[in-house]
From Swiss-Prot:
Gene: cysN
Biological processes, Gene Ontology terms: hydrogen sulfide biosynthetic process; sulfate assimilation
Region (G4): 168-171
Organism: Escherichia coli O139:H28 (strain E24377A / ETEC)
GO molecular function per UniProt: ATP binding; GTP binding; GTPase activity; sulfate adenylyltransferase (ATP) activity
Entry superkingdom: Bacteria
Any Pfam family matching the protein: GTP_EFTU
The protein's Enzyme Commission number: 2.7.7.4
Region (G1): 34-41
tr-type G domain location: 25-239
Annotated stretches, region: G2: 92-96
Protein name per Swiss-Prot or TrEMBL: Sulfate adenylyltransferase subunit 1
Family per record: Belongs to the TRAFAC class translation factor GTPase superfamily. Classic translation factor GTPase family. CysN/NodQ subfamily.
NCBIfam families, per the entry: CysN (TIGR02034), PRK05124.1 (NF003478), small_GTP (TIGR00231)
Amino acid sequence: MNTALAQQIANEGGVEAWMIAQQHKSLLRFLTCGSVDDGKSTLIGRLLHDTRQIYEDQLSSLHNDSKRHGTQGEKLDLALLVDGLQAEREQGITIDVAYRYFSTEKRKFIIADTPGHEQYTRNMATGASTCELAILLIDARKGVLDQTRRHSFISTLLGIKHLVVAINKMDLVDYSEETFTRIRKDYLTFAEQLPGNLDIRFVPLSALEGDNVASQSESMPWYSGPTLLEVLETVEIQRVVDAQPMRFPVQYVNRPNLDFRGYAGTLASGRVEVGQRVKVLPSGVESNVARIVTFDGDREEAFAGEAITLVLTDEIDISRGDLLLAADEALPAVQSASVDVVWMAEQPLSPGQSYDIKIAGKKTRARVDGIRYQVDINNLTQREVENLPLNGIGLVDLTFDEPLVLDRYQQNPVTGGLIFIDRLSNVTVGAGMVHEPVSQATAAPSEFSAFELELNALVRRHFPHWGARDLLGDK
């Protein structure tokens, strides 16, 4: 146990009292992102070090590792606290998404350290999908780069509304206010093109030296704003799902004995209470909530984000992937949708291909009807493309094999977020955010089956000399 933790426990009056205090602290999930070598891992290491979250044995190990793998000369290489893979330490880069936990007197934090290299953009998107705030690091010597723009766009695409632009390595530009002002202006000019109403803040800092990370810098008297830690401790996060209608995706049917049948899952949005009239989709059957069962016992009501088991008054057919919502809400099932896609596979995404789709516990199949555009992250313009390459971001039209109940991702990430799975290798090849569900009345009917379209795409790709026509293009 480190001395800081021991002191906190003593101040709270024992381990049990300390654990209760921890449970009542608010939790902030955030990620660090930016271009390669901007100092993301070093910043997290500095946060852990300056908030005294490192155990004595970890600190001793860090001294030894800094001598073998360090890139900071005689100084501690704080990035090694986060970069755990051997390849990461040898190359001095981040490859995988690394998660770390720490807490202060005001708040608990879960950090996702994401890679900066373009070929690992898919890892960055994975890390951003569960976060509420993004720290975008910019090297003060280089300014705003392509990866900065890419990560900014992906973060906002995944619903992150709070961006902290940390202009790092200020010590290498002599803590120049002019440099900070120029980069701030450049980023704000770019950010005008980002979607949504964003909360953007700027902090000049040096992760290596500790300036403006957890304590105010004496080297930058011209900056009177909060430190990075103060921003993280005080930012107010308004969760979108709290204000949304009730959504309860069924994860599994809990049947421990003959006398109990419950439907387990995590309440995706809204609230539910005992006695509430609910509807099961896609069947449309209605019932009342008889019990709300949790690990700590029965509850009268539950809120978004809580893992619960619902017991209904009627025995009706409900299975994994079904959705429970308020009975008076009209939410039609759809079979088509336009989806924002971040592609993560070497094999491009092309019209006519079919993939397994997973969304809110349900697994089905979808066909790619077409690619409307790919986003150029340099200027956020849209351009027409025939396929979506690795790390490409674009808007895609999908048709599902069965009707699904979908929300727009910006309204509900659980019922609006999906993944693409390769049907042969079972590898996740893409992430999708529902842009707009297409109602059955406006969905264009297809005269070809999913199998026919997939076979057509296969023949055109591998046997072009046969001269097979494009069924999608010739409709």
